[in-house]
Amino acid sequence: MIFIIFFNLAQNIDAPFFSAYLLEELHISYISYQLITATMAVMTMLVVVWWGKRADKAGRIKVLHITALMVPFVSLLWLVSSSVAWLCAVQVYSGFAWAGFNLCAGMFIWDAAPQENRTRYIALFGAFNALGITIGSLIGGNLGPHLPKISGSYFLTLFLVAGIVKLIVVLGLFRRISEVRNVQSIKATDLLFGDLNPTALATWWRRIYDRSQR
């Protein structure tokens, strides 16, 4: 619970300011803005079931570990380019990572909560998580204008700082949590790319062909 609260605090150091960066500093059109924001939402919907199957197989913690290490790089990737095409690509990556993290964070809190006090435990988590989000936003809002600028923008510096803070939180706190369910041990590479082996791909194509013949 502590890890997720601090991770969301770190996430909200810069999360509320992506829209301001796009609209006030890059001056992109509202159509481009909607495209960038919708890309993440669509990607999340496409992969959330995929992540769920992997969480059932390898456990919530395994998926949390993978996705928690991916999320900090979302902020860092925003420093690479300000083109709409690049930012849409970053949002694809972001939607992929956040779909797994949010899904498994919620399921892990449910699994870890003592059954006799589950409602109280989850309510306390929600309250402290909301407090962490508020504190993170306040830190970002007050810190941003005082940071040195990268390419003429303090938003980019804020993204860099937030990405580093998120990495520190993951590396410092994640080791303190452990899986509460009995799950099989599986390598991260097998969890992510296991479906890309020839047998799995052949099965996938066979299912598509069978459905097309119905």
Located regions from the model:
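Pair of pore-lining "gating" transmembrane helices in MFS-fold secondary transporters
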Residues: 1-16, 92, 206-212
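Short amphipathic helix-loop junctions that connect adjacent transmembrane helices
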Residues: 16-32
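Helix-to-loop junctions at the C-terminal end of transmembrane segments
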Residues: 46-59, 144
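Cytoplasmic membrane-interface "Motif A"-like loop-to-helix N-cap segments
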Residues: 57-68, 150-153
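Structural signature of the two symmetry-related core transmembrane helices
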Residues: 62-77, 163
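Helix-loop junctions at membrane interfaces in 12-TM secondary transporters
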Residues: 77-91
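Intracellular juxtamembrane helix-capping segments at the cytosolic ends
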Residues: 100-114
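A membrane-interface helix-boundary motif in multi-pass transporters
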Residues: 144-164
